Design a protein with these regions (language model features):
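Short, flexible, surface-exposed loop segments at domain boundaries
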Residues: 2-195
Length: 195
């Protein structure tokens, strides 16, 4: 889906930039935690990956601070479905309620994922859409990626998100996206990306 496509396009761009500029001083790629926290601002678009902790905070493993033009429906979330309410047409990823509507599109690699009735607790999905002010994610597209979970059980405790930074706490080295508290550590790999 577009989140992963952007990720690979950005990585390819950085590789090409490095190849094209051989002989020139190479730009610094990874940012320190202090540089990350200084760069993060409320309203800044980011793409992050991390590991969910027992207290439901997220230890950030990778972060891209993004600049460019974004639309209200450019948000995305990838993770394990924790709850499903077929009647309300709603699922929960981490603690984020994800609602679908009649125009939501469904897909998977095999082409067999056709509707919300196939979403189950434990499914590994990517949703794209709009994160609303009330804390609900309105999905325009749901992709079932459960085959990846079968191949790598470590994904069960991971989360990926693309969206706007809501709050930054420099003292705690944390920020929030979609209500998730995300912790920056010395192991966090981060860079700025132009979209």
């Amino acid at each position: 889906m577009k989140t992963r496509n952007r990720f690979f396009a950005a990585a390819l761009g950085l590789l090409l930039l490095g190849a094209a500029s051989s002989g020139w001083a190479q730009p610094k790629v990874w940012m320190t935690p202090a540089e990350i926290m200084a760069a993060l601002k409320p309203g800044q678009w980011v793409q992050m990956e991390g590991t969910i902790q027992k207290d439901l905070t997220v230890m950030c493993t990778q972060l891209k601070i993004m600049t460019g033009d974004f639309l209200d429906d450019d948000w995305s979330l990838v993770g394990v479905v924790r709850k499903v309410d077929q009647e309300k047409q709603q699922m929960e990823i981490m603690r984020i309620p994800v609602k679908v509507h009649k125009d939501t599109e469904y897909e998977n690699e095999a082409g067999t994922f056709k509707g919300f009735s196939q979403v189950k607790v434990g499914s590994f999905v990517e949703v794209e859409g709009t994160y609303l002010k009330d804390g609900t994610f309105l999905a325009k597209e749901v992709e079932d990626e459960s085959q990846k979970l079968a191949e790598d059980s470590g994904l069960e405790n991971t989360i990926e998100a693309e969206g706007k930074v809501e709050k930054v706490d420099v003292a705690k080295s944390t920020f929030t996206v979609m209500g998730m508290t995300i912790k920056i550590t010395n192991q966090t790999k981060s860079r700025s990306v132009i979209r």
